[in-house]
Regions:
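Rieske [2Fe-2S] iron-sulfur domain-containing proteins
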Residues: 1-261
């Protein structure tokens, strides 16, 4: 079949999904040994473009599942729980898909009206197969860092610019471009206010491993950082509370005996 020959396809989404699964299953058993190097590279481009478009289709599907709370029919209380447990994606991939969908899908408001994507230029690039979910996650990350005081038109222009450069860059490259854009929009941090800090703040305490150790991740406000600095200055000075030294002074530095130190 010629590459430009039209193929009659059904309109029903479920039928299209079943058809795509059959195509992928057939492709998985295909032998590429007879293909030329040029054909191999062309096929890789086609498949990557298809995968990126699948990200867009998946986002549209998840938006409908979320709007209709269809995940409850599967016994889950939230979309995230359905993705992580029902589809067995795990928390990390479930979060990635939620972020992608929130940025490029057409969601419904409380009145049932379908809204335009939050990131319209990004959604268009995904529909073209030019960028994928990893690009969308980085664009979302950069857009969240734009101060609230920035004019909405400037913000929209920033999203369009990020989507444009994403068509030619890796996700890491988009992040670099995003940081340059942020430096241009708010070079000295003067536009960032308390609303932005509250919106961006986060603190995560990971679960304990087999050694009962836990990882910590966070993005601290100036106030919380100051509290940590006071605690570290008091309890973590050199020579204080050293578990390798039974004779090490215990407690706060202010309460330690100078003679012992």
């Amino acid at each position: 079949m010629a590459a430009n020959q039209a193929v009659a396809l059904p309109d029903d989404p479920a039928e299209l999904a079943a058809l795509s699964e059959a195509v992928i299953a057939k492709l998985a058993t295909a032998a590429f040994t007879a293909s030329t190097e040029g054909q191999l590279l062309e096929t890789a481009e086609i498949l990557e473009r298809a995968n990126r478009r699948f990200d867009g289709a998946t986002s549209a599907l998840l938006a409908e599942i979320s709007d209709r709370s269809a995940y409850r029919k599967a016994g889950f209380l939230s979309l995230h729980a359905y993705l992580a447990g029902g589809l067995r994606l795990g928390d990390g991939e479930a979060k990635r898909r939620r972020i992608t969908g929130a940025g490029i899908a057409r969601l419904a408001n409380l009145q049932g009206e379908t809204l335009a994507p939050v990131f319209p230029a990004t959604a268009e690039a995904v529909a073209d197969g030019a960028i994928g979910a990893d690009h969308v996650v980085v664009i979302d990350e950069m857009m969240r860092k734009i101060p609230s005081a920035v004019d909405p038109q400037v913000r929209a222009g920033a999203e369009a610019r990020l989507a444009e450069v994403a068509r030619d860059l890796t996700p890491a490259g988009v992040r670099t471009a995003g940081h340059r854009l942020l430096a241009h929009l708010d070079p000295d941090g003067a536009l960032t206010d308390e609303r932005d800090r509250k919106r961006l703040r986060q603190f995560g305490l990971g679960g304990q491993d087999q050694r009962l150790m836990s990882k910590v991740r966070g993005y601290l406000t100036p106030e919380l950082r100051a509290r940590f600095e006071v605690m570290f200055d008091s309890w973590a000075k050199p020579g204080m509370n050293n578990p390798a030294d039974p004779a090490s002074p215990r407690g706060a530095a202010e309460a330690a005996d100078p003679a012992t130190l």
